[in-house]
């Protein structure tokens, strides 16, 4: 009975009543003894009483029936209600199958099979991204965070799983430097890997919050206007949550040539869209690579897959003279996208943004407002645009300069819902939704980003 967070079943001639209460009580926050196994905890009838009261209304016989056993036991819940499976990214050879969120028995056969295959072959036998341990973020081991979040995730098992439903607890951990400015403009935030991201913008006088529904939700018209602004004028997205990985050293080029399906041997300042493949030709990483110098490259990956992609890089690092660094927090990303993007940037920058001076697929250092940025001419929405990589300490200024000048160019602040609809309209892939490690790069329609003539690379034999 999801509305009452309860379940009923016959058990050895008796009625068993259990529950996934909406607000759970964290246990073991101070540590769990090494010899602990599943056991009974002290009775906590006050905590269970609201569930029992609703059960009596549903089954009045319970009011006179005696309670044979009141069992209170612990169960493991993760921050996102999915279990952890796979090799720990920090420790090679350390395999994990944990956090089963009360579905351990039903998952055991499949999870055991998948993990055994993964351990034996070195690759998961099929797409396991939803339960892959590499989705976990380093900050999620913080006990204060866990105490707050798991009090909610248990109850979500029996809650309505509305599209785009956001967690309510343990929020605000990772924020863009312009978080408060976006909030003042009506941003309604969603969470991804701890990042607070503007998903859509409420109009003046509109309550800036989700109203969940199985039908069109309250943000639909807002998102439509944002989408049209990107198509017809210019939109501004805060994509600071992009994962940013710096790969540098004298062996950086051959290291990336072995991992990437596209050709990394390009001039400094060039941007290359590529995938990293497994031995089956499946897609392990979907990214852009910008060559910064002869020995330095910047990899831009989805924020949700950053830990996965870092683990993939480090797993394949041998004796090469290469340093891999997560530089995500050092730069913000402001995406100026739409037919008027060039005119807007030209209004606040002395640099030349023409096709001749700044062609597609190149990155250049620019002046903007009173700040500096690195402008990448790429697009994830299918329109003319630039991604501006700005030092975190200058982001607020650059944002204000763009907004102030934007009124003359039809600028509209846009959220992630609009980014998603635009990239779907253009058929741009998104890892975890459209492509995974079990999707062959050619079957995914990404053969244009595969260069077999460049020489050997992981997955070449499969394509």
Regions found by a protein language model. Name each.
Residues 17, 24-27, 104-106, 199, ...:
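A short local loop/turn or secondary-structure capping micro-motif enriched for an aromatic residue
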Residues 11-13, 22, 89-91, 294, ...:
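Short strand-connecting beta-turns/loops that link adjacent beta-strands
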Residues 1-3, 12, 25-174:
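C-terminal catalytic lobe of FAD-dependent flavoproteins
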Residues 16, 84, 93-96, 298, ...:
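General beta-strand recognition
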Residues 9, 17-20, 97, 400:
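Beta-strand scaffold of nucleotide-dependent catalytic cores
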Residues 126-463:
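Glycine/proline-enriched, intrinsically flexible loops and inter-domain linkers
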Residues 12-15, 21-24, 74, 101, ...:
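Glycine-rich beta-alpha junction loops
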